[in-house]
A protein has these predicted regions:
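Juxtamembrane intracellular "pre-TM" segments in multi-pass secondary transporters
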Residues: 1-5, 195-231
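Helix-loop boundary and gating motifs at the non-cytosolic
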Residues: 2-54, 227-232, 236-255, 265
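Hydrophobic core of transmembrane alpha-helices in multi-pass small-molecule transporters
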Residues: 17, 85, 99-121
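Residue-level signature of mid-helix packing/kink "hotspots" within the transmembrane helices
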Residues: 52-60, 121, 154-155, 270-278
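C-terminal ends and interior cores of transmembrane alpha-helices
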Residues: 80-102
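Cytoplasmic helix-loop-helix junction between adjacent transmembrane helices
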Residues: 110-150
Length: 280
């Protein structure tokens, strides 16, 4: 890679890392947030589904918008949504709701996860940036950085929880503040350092071709190889997301593990992901 491409590669990697880092911090402490306002396990499940469903719905449209308007502005838009969503979540958790109706903080939690999910296309856009700057023969190696970023975010995010979370009184002030600050830092880094990787000529071409996003999406799935690959990813992410979400709740509620202890299991997941993805 040329020096400017190396810099863009580093910027995209850091953008992806920071994006997943906030989620990795929130994952082990979200069950405790829900239990502050509702004792039902189903409520936590619905909260997780809200985020994942919103992300599933919005990501294809965000990818198409990045073709039409460029990678950089769409990435900034997504990060802005994350800042808003995590800020609402932080306010909900840190505010004293003792004299309020219980449904209000629950509504804000769901609203926060919905906004964060709808704007959760940073990973998809960063992946597209990596595709833009890498040659076909080096694309697989470059895409390996995505797995490294996910693994490293799992490792660092849960390390933050292990170090800063307190086992008493559901005190997660420092991890929540860290999770809130990271998207702001990410926005600043992208705004000043991440260049546009899609040429203006291609952006203008995409603007004229962009008519019906749903039609364009279904056109992609007419390709047999892409259809099979998408199905494989779909099955994998159902298993992985279900495992990580259920595991944390199971460890904390059924085995009475502390948040720090359950975060340690995700640290191991992060280490393995770094080794496997980096090695491949």
């Amino acid at each position: 890679l040329k020096p400017n491409k190396k810099f863009t590669l580093l910027s995209a990697f850091i953008t992806l890392l920071n994006d997943r880092l906030s989620e990795s911090i929130l994952l082990p402490i979200l069950p405790s947030f829900v239990l502050l306002f509702d004792s039902k396990a189903s409520t936590y499940g619905l909260l997780s589904c809200t985020y994942q469903l919103a992300q599933f719905t919005a990501s294809p449209f965000i990818g198409l918008m990045s073709d039409r308007y460029g990678r950089r502005p769409v990435t900034l838009f997504c990060i802005t949504g994350s800042v808003i969503g995590i800020s609402i979540l932080s306010f909900t958790v840190l505010f004293n709701w003792s004299n309020s109706i219980a449904s209000i903080p629950l509504f804000l939690l769901f609203l926060a996860r919905l906004i964060d999910g709808l704007s959760g296309g940073t990973a998809a856009t960063a992946t597209t940036i990596l595709a833009d700057i890498s040659s076909p023969e080096k694309r697989a190696k470059t895409f390996g950085l995505i797995g490294v970023a996910f693994g490293l975010s799992f490792f660092l995010g849960n390390i933050f929880v292990v170090i800063f979370a307190r086992n008493t009184n559901n005190n997660f002030i420092i991890p929540v503040l860290i999770a809130s600050i990271i998207p702001i830092i990410n926005f600043i880094l992208v705004f000043f350092y991440l260049p546009e990787t899609k040429p203006n000529s291609e952006i203008n071409k995409s603007k004229t071709a962009f008519k019906n996003p749903l039609k364009a999406l279904f056109t992609v799935f007419k390709e047999e190889k892409i259809k099979k690959l998408s199905l494989a990813f779909f099955i994998y992410f159902i298993a992985f997301t279900g495992l990580t979400n259920i595991l944390i709740f199971f460890l904390q509620e059924s085995l009475n593990w502390t948040t720090k202890a359950s975060s340690g299991t995700l640290v191991v997941v992060g280490i393995i992901a770094i080794i496997v993805q980096g090695g491949l």
